[in-house]
Curated annotation (Swiss-Prot):
Belongs to the insect apolipophorin-3 family. The keyword Transport applies. Induction: By bacterial infection. The lineage of its organism: Eukaryota, Metazoa, Ecdysozoa, Arthropoda, Hexapoda. Its main location: secreted. Hemolymph. GO terms for biological process: lipid transport. Keywords: Hemagglutinin, Lipid transport, Secreted, Transport. GO terms for cellular component: extracellular region. This is Apolipophorin-3. Disulfide bonds: none annotated. Gene3D superfamilies: Apolipoprotein (1.20.120.20).
Length: 35
């Protein structure tokens, strides 16, 4: 299941990275709200 191009692979990784950052940010905000 190789990507069509290196650019497509980069975009896929970027989207996953963005999602991870968003989740970490949300958990950080939520933990601050509960304190």
């Amino acid at each position: 299941d190789a990507p069509a191009s290196p650019l497509a692979d980069i975009e896929k990784h970027a989207a996953e990275f963005q999602k991870t950052i968003s989740e970490q940010f949300n958990s950080l905000v939520n933990s601050k709200n509960t304190q």
